[in-house]
């Protein structure tokens, strides 16, 4: 069986092979869900007598990619970045013809990065291909890993916004809701009380009171879920911040989800749990009429793909743009023609505007495609965003503006 590539991946593959011939290195920066690992598997398939060393953050990611492909490769030796680090002494014995660096932005981590450097120095003739949804390490001084590892040799680059605009990924329905806002209101109250001008204090307290009332009048999560989760026996991935946060969210399942479907099954996946593989496998094969929720922490941010997902639910404090896009990307799959649901449940006011970054990417892609005379590649220019707390966001922005100018 030969690997068939979607048009966008075939174009990227052609650029990769040309660049590898010319430069010996190439990076592909495509969003989650577009199937970029297939580009590397295709390369291995086309060069059966060449030896490939495939590095990735976890064996789990690699095994899932192979399972989804339904193929085996005799010419690929797999190794996780941490295993490479533990076996640094045997790097000299590897002698690959090709090195695949999957999720290559992770090579910026101090220890992993050192062993990857050592490998690249030990194999100067090996061609290297990097795959990632992002080349920037946002929380690490904006380091550009495509520059550091591939000398800026990018064979193909696409943002999440462009992938949606071009119809490579389906346009989602995006719902923004809010919960547990008391702490946020308390912090705003303290900022107001710290003002020196009594007139300003009174004015801002009025705004805060309006905001509090608007939040109290907004629908609770039970009604938000009941209204928007229309695939009542669908599969949803629920992202949480940590184990404690996950346990708290799971404790609310009966009150929040019973209006969607009284029969709910909860699966849990997190990296320290030995039962994760089984839970994940059961979730993937569950075809029952129950509402299926897979609660996870850090398992599915990158690399792992699940078929037949109806949507994702993000219960999140503020997170890096990389993780935010990876989590959204779990709901979007190339070749899928349904409208996936993204429920973004934030516990801070800043989180209400996260989606604006993606909307900006889409507008940028639209302008660029029109400017390049490629308007015919535009499939959609925007997607539906439902703000359950629109008034709250507007009031919060007014209050922020007022408080900022009060401090100046």
Regions found by a protein language model. Give the residues of each.
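Conserved helicase motor
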Residues: 56-61, 79-87, 106-109, 240-244, ...
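Conserved helicase ATPase core of P-loop NTP-dependent helicases/translocases
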Residues: 63, 247-248, 253, 261-300
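Conserved SF2 helicase motif VI
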Residues: 319-340
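SF2 helicase catalytic motif II
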Residues: 91-136
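Walker A/P-loop
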Residues: 22-43
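Interdomain helical connector at the RecA1-RecA2 junction of SF1/SF2 helicase-like NTPases
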Residues: 140-236, 250
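Conserved pre-motif I regulatory segment
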Residues: 1-27
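A conserved SF2-helicase RecA2
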Residues: 160-170, 333-403
């Amino acid at each position: 069986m030969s690997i068939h590539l979607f048009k966008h991946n075939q174009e990227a593959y052609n650029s990769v092979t040309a660049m590898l011939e010319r430069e010996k290195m190439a990076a592909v920066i495509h969003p989650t869900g577009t199937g970029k690992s297939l580009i590397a598997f295709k390369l291995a398939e086309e060069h059966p007598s060449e030896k490939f060393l495939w590095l990735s953050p976890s064996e789990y990611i690699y095994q899932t990619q192979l399972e989804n492909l339904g193929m085996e490769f005799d010419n690929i030796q797999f190794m996780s970045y941490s295993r490479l680090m533990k076996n640094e002494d045997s790097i000299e014995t590897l002698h690959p013809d090709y090195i695949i660096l999957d999720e290559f932005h992770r090579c910026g981590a101090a220890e992993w990065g050192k062993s990857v450097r050592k490998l690249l120095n030990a194999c100067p003739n090996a061609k290297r291909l990097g795959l990632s949804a992002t080349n920037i390490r946002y929380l690490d001084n904006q380091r550009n890993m495509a520059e550091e590892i591939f000398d800026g040799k990018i064979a193909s680059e696409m943002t999440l916004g462009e992938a949606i605009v071009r119809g490579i990924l389906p346009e989602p329905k995006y719902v923004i809701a809010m919960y547990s806002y008391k702490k946020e209101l308390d912090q705003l109250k303290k900022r107001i009380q710290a003002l020196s001008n009594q007139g300003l204090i009174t004015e801002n307290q009025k705004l805060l009171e309006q905001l509090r009332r608007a939040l109290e009048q907004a629908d609770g999560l039970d009604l938000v879920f009941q209204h928007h989760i229309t695939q009542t026996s669908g599969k949803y991935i629920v992202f949480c911040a940590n184990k404690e946060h996950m346990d708290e969210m799971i404790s609310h399942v009966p009150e929040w989800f019973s209006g969607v479907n009284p029969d709910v099954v909860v699966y849990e996946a997190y990296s320290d749990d030995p039962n994760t593989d089984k839970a994940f496998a059961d979730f993937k094969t569950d075809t029952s009429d129950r509402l299926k929720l897979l609660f996870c922490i850090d398992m599915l941010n990158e690399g792992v793909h699940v078929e037949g997902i109806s949507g994702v639910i993000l219960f999140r404090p503020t997170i890096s743009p990389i993780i935010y896009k990876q989590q959204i990307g779990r709901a979007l799959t190339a070749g899928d023609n349904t409208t996936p649901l993204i429920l973004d449940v934030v516990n801070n006011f800043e989180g209400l505007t996260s989606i604006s970054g993606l909307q900006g990417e889409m507008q940028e892609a639209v302008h660029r495609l029109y400017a390049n005379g490629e308007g015919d590649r535009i499939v959609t220019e925007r997607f539906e965003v439902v703000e359950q707390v629109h008034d709250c966001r507007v009031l919060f922005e007014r209050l922020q503006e007022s408080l900022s100018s009060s401090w100046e």
